[in-house]
Structure formats: structure tokens, C-alpha cells
Amino acid sequence: MAAIGVHFGYTCACVAVFKDGRADVVANDAGDRVTPAVVAYRDTEQIVGIAAKQGRIRNAANTVVKVKQILGRRYDDPDAQAHKEESKCIVVNKSGLPRYEIDTGETTKYVSPEDVAKLIFHKMKETAQSALGSDVKDAVITVPFEFDEMQKNALRQAAESAGFNVLRLIHEPSAALLAYDIGQDSPLGKSHVLVYKLGGTSLSVTVLEVNSGVYRVLATQTDHQTGGESFTQELAQHLAAEFKKTFKQDVSGNARAMMKLMNSADVAKHTLSTLGSANCFVDSLYDGMDFECNVSRARFELICSSLFNKCIQPIKSLLEQVNLSTSDVNKVVLSGGSARIPKLQQMIRDLFPDVELLNSIPPDEVIPVGAAMQAGILVGKDSLALGEDSITVDCCASDITLKEVDDSGLEVFTVLFPSGTPLPARRQHTLQGPGSLSSVRLQLFQAQQPIAQIVLGDLEPKEELHDVVTVLTMKRDGSLHVTCTEQSSGRSEAITIETAAAAS
């Protein structure tokens, strides 16, 4: 049975299949290798992909886009609230959790983000099965570096509910390195690789250290305010200005007209990655008036000049953070659909004039290809080119902090796994309390979010101090096992948290 890799992005999804020693992205039923992560509800029907995206103008209130922004979030989470404000589909509060309000015509139903994601994963499963002519279950799923435990679990559960057996969650920079077999071509000595990802709604830059086939994340930076859609919006605003100049009508405040211009701008943006000019035509843009405008690549680059500069700045700040110069970087890997833009590639080349820029695999396909190769490793495909000594060293995406609370209510915070800690890792922490102590409550936080707690109660009073030893073991996949033991009595409690905070 073949193994597959699935990249579930903010705006698009893509699936790659590992078979006969190689990984390849496969096309969906529309012939496209990338599928819009868009789900539309119409009567009793659910539509996924390009048809849902194209029909959004007429069915915006029942069309869900960018569901990944809200996966694993509570309703009052700031990111969920930002998604609610942006979404044309109404987001409501149901028992503290976000739900999409869908009008089916006869009734109103409330759909969870996980159920929306399930439909997208199912589309990826169907795509892979159609290409292979057989059922597929085993899959490696990609996740952003900064995803927390709740987001990872939500993504995993959505994939499993779609029928996948999730072999592993792999972080996007690691998948990009695996796709290019980095670490095997020069297995001896230390090198540095920069992974640049410009997706639909976010920009991330990651620096990894490669040493004898072992990958270790040094640092990453993510900007959720900048992505490929930022370029589309700039171009759409330009088209609106051109329409106003020609027809003396301002459509910038008309949601329906601007959605049409966004669609046209998106097509033009993709065209300009391969051609020198693009023709934008919108039928009946406003008040029955058609609109046509030609945009050259040079004009597009001028319109988006400030955005291009904004996309380069994180590279400079990240290198400064890890005390590396551009000459210390040996390779740059491009990923994300908008990393195809020629101007952006040229600016990165100018920044790294003597560094190999890897873009032979289409940037929007490199991450699922790497995920499929990881899947091939995990199911034991002997024909895989990567050697068994090729290891991705996962690390904590954010701090794991322990909060202790004793009988008196005293709170003590200790960071046990700082962000960037290589995994697997083990930490031991000792708390000394008075003999009268009857219980200890420990809470675990990822960044500032509580993820679990453990209570050691019914401690016997004693004359000397209580020694309470807490041992935390975090595996490569981010699962965290915690044991809390009172030393003199041997009384102990233990918990396990799945996929707590790993990043690879």
C-alpha cells in the first residue's frame, strides 16, 4: 500500500504519493495539482475545491475559506475573533467553541471547523486514491512550526475522521529539506539551510543546522499578516483604481465587485509568474459594466514594491537572531505557492549571491513531496533514497512551563523546555515543601496556554520536608509524559499529553 503526504495549507491543499522509490504530487479531478482549501454548502451538498472557490461570489455566506486559521481555537481566542471578522460565513459561539452558521434554505445548521477540515482531507484522500487506483490510509500530515497542542490535535482528528491513519505530523521546514534530500549529499560537516515559505496568508522563515545527516531547527519567524493574498489585494486595489479612472465609479467599498476583482487579480498574479503581462477581464463588474485591464510584470512589481521589501526583512532579522551572516548559509529552499514570484526569487538571490537557491521542485509542491518521503520512511520503503541515518531533530516550538501550587496558594513558574529545545529531551524538577503539605498541583503551559495539570494528593504529614520530584520526558513527536513522585512515600501520579509542542 502506498504512503502519502498531505499539506493542508491556509488557502490550498496538496497531496503527494510515495511509490516506487519516489514522491510525486498528484492532480485532482479538475486536473490541478493544488486544490483550494475552500468548502461551500449548498442545500444538502458540500462542494470542495475550485468549484467552491469559483462559486463564492454568489454563495459567500455559505462558503468557508481559511478554516486552518480557526482549527483548535476557542471562540474567544484572538485568532478566532480575527477570522470571524474576516469571514463572509457567519461564525458563532457554541459552548465556547466557534461554529460556522450555514443556511441550507430550509434550516440553519452549525458546522465545526474540524468538520470543514475533514471534507478537505477527504478530498485529498479521494485525489490520491484516484491516482493510485486503490485505497490509501497511511499519511504524514504537515503542520506549521508554531501550531500548539490543540491545533495539532484538531488537524490530526480531522484527518483521521476523513479515513487517514496519521503516521506522523511533520513540520513544514523539515518536509522541505527531505524533499531535496538535504543532508545526504554532504553528510560530513556542519551546514546551514534557510527555508523560506510564502503561502497564501503567511510568511515564515526558518534556519536549520544540518550536521552528518541530522537536521536541527535553530530559529523561525512567522508573519501572519503577509502572504500571497497580500499581493492579490494590492493588485485588486490597483484594478479598482483603474476602473474608477475609466468609469468614474468607486467600487472599493462594494464587497461583491471587490471579490470579482480579487478573483481576477489572483489569476493575473499567477500568470505573471510565467509571462510578462496578464489580461484582467471581469464580466459585469458593476452596474452591467464590463472591465478589462492589462497589467505588465513590471507594473505588478511596482504596485507591490513595499510588499516585496516586507517579504525580505524577516530573512535579515532571523539571521541576526541566530548570529549568522548570509555567507554562513549554504542553501536556501523556497516553498509556498507565492515563492514562485520571479521578483521575490531575484531579491533572495541578490541577498545570497553565492548560495544555492533550491526551487527545482515547484515551491507549492515541495512540502507535500517531503511529507510523502517521510511517509515512505515510516512505512519502511527500502527503495527510498534517504539513508536511515537521515534524522530530523524536532524541537519545542514554544516554551513548556511548569506551574506549582502548594497548600498556601504559592505559585512557582519554571521553564523546563525553552523554545528550540532539541527533542527527545528529559527534565527533572524537585519541589521541597513543608511536612504539613497535603497536596501539590502542577500545571503545564505551552507559551501562555494551559495544556494539562497533575495533582499529587493525600500526602502524609511528616516532620521533615516533602521532596516531590517531577520528571518530564518529551518525545520527538512532541508527546509529553509527566511523572510526579513524593520520594519518602513513593506516592506517584502520571499523565501523558499527545503532541504537546514539537516542531521539526
Swiss-Prot record:
GO annotation, biological process: chaperone cofactor-dependent protein refolding; protein refolding
One Gene Ontology term, aspect cellular component: nucleus
Keywords recorded for this protein, A-Z: ATP-binding, Chaperone, Cytoplasm, Nucleotide-binding
Coiled coil: none
UniProt xrefs under InterPro entries: ATPase_NBD, HSP70_peptide-bd_sf, Hsp_70_fam, HSPA14_NBD
Assembly mode: Component of ribosome-associated complex (RAC).
Family: Belongs to the heat shock protein 70 family.
Function comment: Component of the ribosome-associated complex (RAC), a complex involved in folding or maintaining nascent polypeptides in a folding-competent state.
This protein's name: Heat shock 70 kDa protein 14
Organism listed in the record: Danio rerio
Upper classification of the organism: Eukaryota, Metazoa, Chordata, Craniata, Vertebrata
Designated gene of the protein: hspa14
